[in-house]
Amino acid sequence: MLKLLNLTEDEHDQFVESHPHGDLLQLTDWAQSKHLTGWYSRRFAVGNEAGETLGVALLLFKKVPKLNHTLCYISRGFVCDYHDPLLVEFMLKEALNIARDEKAYAIKIDPDLPLETHRDTIEFLESIGFRHRGLKDGMSKDNIQPRQTMVASIDKDDKALLQSFERNNRTKVRNAIRRGTRVYRAEREDLKTFVTLMKETGQRDGFLTRDITYFESLYDNLHDNGHMELFLVKLMPTEVAASLEVDMEKVERDLEKAMKKKDGSKKENQIKDLSNRKEKLGKQQQEIEEISKRHPEGVILSGALLAQAGHKAYYLYGASSDQYREYLPNHHMQYEMMKYARDNGARTYDFGGVSVSPPEDSPHFGLWQFKKVWGTQVSEKVGEFDYVIHRPFYTLAEVGVPMFQKGKVKLNQTLKALKERR
């Protein structure tokens, strides 16, 4: 016999963090962070007669502009065993009660269920009234959350973790560590620096960025509960200079030894290689000397927001400077964040959405190339489902409004083009 339970926020979060289908987006502090963007939440829990919790759901609601209705979005929920049909149906019934009370035109869910083990769940959810929105590409704008993400297993020691990366990426990580960047956990006031980097990244890669209030809301709500950290990477000129000096001394010693060898092609080639190496190091020393003059205290090159819910870590947002990219700050940062997440109980590290194996001319190709070299596997989920409560409003909100918005964008583009011709 199933029944509703009255859980505290802590009890709800503990269940989410311990459940295999739990997710960051079902935590109560995540819901609180969404208040800034107009969402509010309600939640419920289901258990057995003994009072054991079997499932929970956090429901987000947002009012639809111009309509006296809301959308109910259970992001990465329900959190329960989907192979227990009675439990899922009971949870749907309660979700419908709450959704109708909030005048929702539909309930949208996108549970954290691997497609590989839950293909039958798609048919089951359709049989109880849900509409499956299809197995969309991971970068599709038709889904709120990406259906396909890249996830790395990180429950291993440092050596094994590094070894799990693709060969070329291992080399880049080692080089990044040697080149004098320092990765550290930053404080709330450093969000200003992060947002500046984010704007720079958005301009470079052609996407719109959020203002600082959004990131402050995330940090303020999730950080104190151990669900979020801000990381920054700083180039330390003095450390780089010291490292280059050691390298230069070694090259000069090797060059001196090579000069004393018997003449021959082998000697000539070795001297040539060492001379080229010495010249390159000399240029690097000059460059770092200039950097040191401009930034004597160091310069921030990149940053990221790392989130965690139980055994799952998430690379939420990343940003980097256009300057000094040859120091590979992102590679050093990712490695350190993976180690930090592991040391704090995470077993997996989610790099976020991708388009799987896109063609080279795809705008998503670079993202795929970056995310696939970290020992990651594609995590393919069952996708997004809608339960329609009020069909006319659903059709208007899900079809009519997007069509109107697209038409408005096209009209603005046309008017802009005509204006430019004058």
Predicted regions, residues:
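Juxtamembrane/interface motifs at transmembrane-helix termini
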Residues: S75, T213-E216, E336, V401-P402
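A general structural signal for short secondary-structure boundary/capping elements
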Residues: A104-Y105, F194-L197, E229-F231, Y349-F351, ...
